[in-house]
Amino acid sequence: MVFMLYDGFQPLDLAGPWQAFSSANEEAGRPLYQLSTIAATPVVSTWEQGLRMQVDGTFEQDGDAPIDMLLVPGGPGADRASAHAETMAWLRRRDAGAPRTCSVCTGAFVLAAAGLLDGRAVTTHWRSADRLRQMHPALRVQDDRIFIESGKYWTSAGVTAGIDLALALIERDVGAALSQQVARRLVVFMRRDGDQRQYSQTLRLQDRVAAPFRDLVEKIEAKLSARWSVDDMADACHMSRRTFQRKFAAHFGVAPTEVLRRLRQERASALQATGKMSKKRVQQHVGPTHNRSAS
């Protein structure tokens, strides 16, 4: 497996997947993945973090040994890498013989610039999705996915989503049991499927407003299964019911009961995705996912 680096790559886009694949080797007790790095120059820099890294080889030194998997991280240098002729030529040549090519975050811009993703469903960091659409209109950009598989190409969202991508690849290659072992080893709270949201409902809500409504969202998240009524929520915000409902609707654009339903539904979907809880247990954990419980 080869990680193609460039000046200005995001170190977490490299470190997260690298550690996951390394841990898979350790958990399996055999070298499932042989990991290496390559770039146009012997040393690359991360720019923002000031880190410098010596790679295992350069494009000029590279021969024709088979590559089973290519992975391109994202980073602020992705645009410059996309315009670098030697980088594009090497990527196209090696992709032609690789059974699988992947990107993390804005690494999708690099693959797209090489013409590898035309007509495919792809994802990237949600902040960069609109720009990817504008620069590469032939792509079908889905900005609310953790990762997407389209043929031999796998693209993922930003930073920690690279770990989710790696865990999915390990499961595909070796099986769910080893992937779960790696997740536990990395102390990953919960493995996320590719179709889960990049940006959680809680963060969406918290980004919109300040206290007391942000604090209310946190309180509800901490006790989702509680019998939250509108009066309970109003009391938590130290408001009368009427004032609370008016201000809440002005901030969020929906009723308090709808926000409660969305938070419960998101948590329920995440728990069900693990396959470890029955539907009944999930409901006990999060409470009812309809609006009739709060009034």
Which stretches of residues belong to each language-model region?
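A conserved active-site-flanking secondary-structure segment within enzyme catalytic domains
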Residues: 117-146, 181-182, 186
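Accessory alpha-helical/coil subdomains and C-terminal extensions
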Residues: 174-218, 226
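Flexible gly/pro-rich beta->alpha loop and the following alpha-helix that scaffold active-site loops
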Residues: 36-101
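N-terminal beta1-alpha1 cap of cysteine-dependent amidohydrolase-like domains
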Residues: 1-61
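Basic, amphipathic alpha-helical hairpins
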Residues: 171-175, 208, 212-229, 248-249, ...
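Catalytic nucleophile loop
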Residues: 90-127
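Conserved anion/nucleotide-ligand pocket segment
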Residues: 145-185
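Basic/polar phosphate-binding segments, predominantly the helix-turn-helix DNA-binding elements
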Residues: 219-221, 226-266, 283-295
